[in-house]
């Protein structure tokens, strides 16, 4: 496997978007407030019946090909993992970009965001995601970032477990983050990797 780092471009995003990001939702993390939060917060996993497929690229206005329309990507980097010249995984990191709500952490410029990560279903659980994550963290550290921030949802339990294995810790839980009807039931989970 070979991982290359490139600036974001329309041509590359078209190729990148062909790597599926969809996953089957088999369980979700339930947020339980103990004593309305004063006694703590607990997460527990609950099976989802029936299971369903979630595809971030199918959400209106989302998907890699739209990023150039929405953001100045000059401080972004795109990582592509290839096997025999075929893209099988990718990751995108955003840095110093006005309009990216996740980078508005008090106006700090020492935080980078793992904006997108995807591995082709036939190549998952082979270490590609870990290799991509490592490259993203290295890139952020080279830019003197203190933290790498990652957003997931409570319905993407495999991603939550993946980020914990990479050394991330849960920093934020927002039960009211999403208002669009198709995702209003989801909880935003923000993970942080300490790069210091």
Which residues make up each language-model segment?
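Conserved GNAT acetyl-CoA-binding A-motif
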Residues: 140-152
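C-terminal "cap" of GNAT-fold acetyltransferases
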Residues: 2, 106, 153-157, 166-172, ...
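Conserved acetyl-CoA-binding loop-helix of GNAT-fold acetyltransferases
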Residues: 119, 125-138, 142, 161-165
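Structural preference for beta-strand elements that scaffold enzyme active sites
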Residues: 111, 147-149, 190
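Acetyl-CoA-dependent GNAT
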Residues: 18, 22-30, 34-111, 115-116, ...
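Short alpha-helical
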Residues: 11, 157-158
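Short polar catalytic/cofactor-binding loops
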Residues: 7-13
């Amino acid at each position: 496997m070979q991982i290359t780092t490139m600036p974001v471009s329309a041509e590359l995003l078209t190729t990148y978007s062909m790597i599926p990001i969809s996953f089957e939702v088999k369980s979700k993390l339930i947020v339980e407030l103990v004593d309305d939060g004063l006694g703590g917060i607990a997460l527990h996993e609950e099976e989802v019946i029936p299971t369903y497929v979630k595809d971030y690229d199918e959400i209106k206005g989302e998907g890699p090909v739209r990023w150039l329309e929405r953001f100045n990507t000059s401080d972004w980097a795109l990582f592509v993992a290839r096997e025999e010249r075929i893209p099988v995984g990718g990751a995108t990191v955003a840095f110093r970009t006005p309009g990216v709500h996740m980078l508005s952490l008090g106006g700090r410029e020492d935080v980078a965001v793992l904006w997108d990560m995807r591995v082709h279903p036939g190549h998952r659980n082979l270490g590609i995601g870990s290799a991509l994550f490592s490259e993203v963290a290295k890139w952020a550290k080279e830019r003197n970032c203190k933290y790498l921030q990652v957003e997931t949802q409570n319905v993407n339990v495999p991603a939550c477990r993946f980020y914990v294995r990479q050394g991330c810790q849960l920093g934020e839980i927002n039960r009211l983050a999403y208002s669009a009807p198709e995702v209003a039931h989801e909880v935003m989970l923000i993970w942080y990797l300490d790069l210091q």
